[in-house]
A protein has these predicted regions:
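N-terminal loops that bind phosphate or other acidic moieties
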Residues: 1-372
Length: 372
């Protein structure tokens, strides 16, 4: 994996931004999350008053477990989804258009051939990752290719002038790889993020099944905090090799590269969340550059895992719209929250600008000014 350097947030810009926010014509702290988002972007961009951000969307396509017993569709559902992106008819693309956000759709590893889809960026490494019950999800060489490609896309989107990128995925059977990646990094027990399904094996049977596969690969880490920086990186890369898959590996590198360019990243589901966890474990400073977005209404699989991912990261999703389609829709809608925070920061007037009185008591006293 290539080397990179991520810098901390620029504190003087954040302090100046916070002072302006506290002096906007509203009760102090009343816009809550919008305020903290704007303040963080000031630190990311080293600008006390960021505005007119340039947005983008990156959708990565890859199937999982193609040689596993659950593969009955053989990529047909994924192909249908990617075909809609090729035609430009998805909800994600509609939402992105409202923010003038360019949408990149990259095929890393769908099981079916997409060479005939002219609007899909063809970067196929292999046609789907393995079932780790058979062999590691991807080879070491495939892992390196996915990582380098992720960094290359971060370089490319930065060169295009983007400042915030919403990430998402298209692909079948990503649940198991996301589950194992999440549990290994957060240290939670499988029973805490598996939900009973009356139509299949019990939770206990599923846990035993997973352990029978993953235990032989030695991916468990007793205490991540006890590892050195290089040991953490190597442990994460081994995890991605065994149970990550092409999309999670690519997105991990993209997130690291984006943060090194001071680009923010918005994530949504368990696949993008797993990549965030991997990137944050490799370099904890990544956490300052990532933002949650939506909760998907999928209580059996996605919801418990995503909840654990957000708990570990110390964040809460902003949007609760009972969405069933992911495909970067949640993260793209998350861009609208960031856009709203920029409008708050730049379009609202301060007490001085509006020539109105400030708070005479309470939290705003002494913090708000009505004259120079």
């Amino acid at each position: 994996m290539r080397t990179f350097k991520i810098e901390p947030l620029h504190v003087p810009s954040m302090e100046a931004c916070r002072l302006r926010i506290d002096n906007l014509t509203k009760p102090i702290y009343s816009l809550a999350t919008l305020e903290s988002i704007a303040e963080r972007f000031a630190g990311i961009l080293r600008n006390p008053k960021p505005n007119h951000l340039r947005y983008g969307v990156l959708v990565v396509a890859a199937d999982h477990l193609v040689d596993g017993p659950q593969n009955t569709e053989h990529g047909s559902e994924s192909y249908d989804a990617i075909e809609r992106f090729n035609e430009g008819t998805t909800a994600t693309q509609g939402a992105a258009a409202k923010l003038n956000a360019v949408v990149h759709v990259v095929n890393l590893g769908l099981e079916q051939d997409t060479a005939d889809l002219a609007n899909i960026e063809q970067q196929v490494i292999r046609k789907g990752s393995h079932f780790f019950g058979v062999e590691p999800a991807i080879s070491r060489e495939e892992l390196e290719r996915a990582l380098e490609l992720g960094f290359a896309y971060a370089d490319r989107l930065h060169a295009d002038g983007l400042q915030v990128v919403a990430i998402g995925n298209v692909g079948e059977r990503a649940f198991l790889d996301s589950l194992v990646t999440t549990a290994t990094i957060t240290g939670c027990a499988y029973e805490d993020i598996l939900v009973h399904n009356e139509y299949g094996p019990t939770v206990e049977q599923r846990i035993a099944h997973i352990h029978s596969f993953v235990d032989r690969f030695n991916i468990d880490v007793d205490d991540w905090s006890a590892l050195s920086e290089s040991e953490r990186r190597d442990a994460v890369l081994n995890l991605l090799h065994v149970a990550g898959g092409l999309d999670i590996a690519f997105l991990t590198a993209f997130i690291l590269g984006a943060a090194s360019h001071r680009m923010a990243v918005v994530f949504d589901n368990v696949v993008t969340g797993a990549a965030i966890l991997a990137a944050v474990t490799i370099d904890p400073l990544v956490k300052d550059y990532v933002f949650p977005s939506a909760v998907y209404d999928e209580p059996i699989h996605d919801e418990p895992i995503h909840k654990e991912q957000c708990r570990f990261l110390g964040v809460k999703p902003y949007l609760h719209y009972s969405l069933l389609i992911d495909e970067a829709l949640g993260s793209t809608m998350g861009l609208s929250i960031i856009d709203a925070s920029m409008h708050m920061l730049n379009d609202m007037k301060t007490f001085i600008e509006a020539e109105v009185s400030v708070a005479e008591d309470g939290a705003g006293k002494g913090r708000q000014k009505d004259k120079e």
